[in-house]
Amino acid sequence: MIKSELVQIVAARNPHLYHRDVENIVNAFL
């Protein structure tokens, strides 16, 4: 799984989050 796919999945499951916040969350896990 690539980073952009992970961002899309997290964003889809958390529609209340801004895209940049989702990216920050993903970056924190990586």
Swiss-Prot record:
It comes from the Bacteria. Keywords: DNA recombination, DNA-binding, Transcription, Transcription regulation, Translation regulation. The keyword Transcription applies. One of its GO terms (biological process) is regulation of translation. GO terms for molecular function: DNA binding. The keyword Transport does not apply. Belongs to the bacterial histone-like protein family. Heterodimer of an alpha and a beta chain. This protein is one of the two subunits of integration host factor, a specific DNA-binding protein that functions in genetic recombination as well as in transcriptional and translational control. Involved in hydrogenase gene expression. This is Integration host factor subunit beta. The lineage of its organism: Bacteria, Pseudomonadati, Pseudomonadota, Alphaproteobacteria, Hyphomicrobiales. The gene is ihfB.
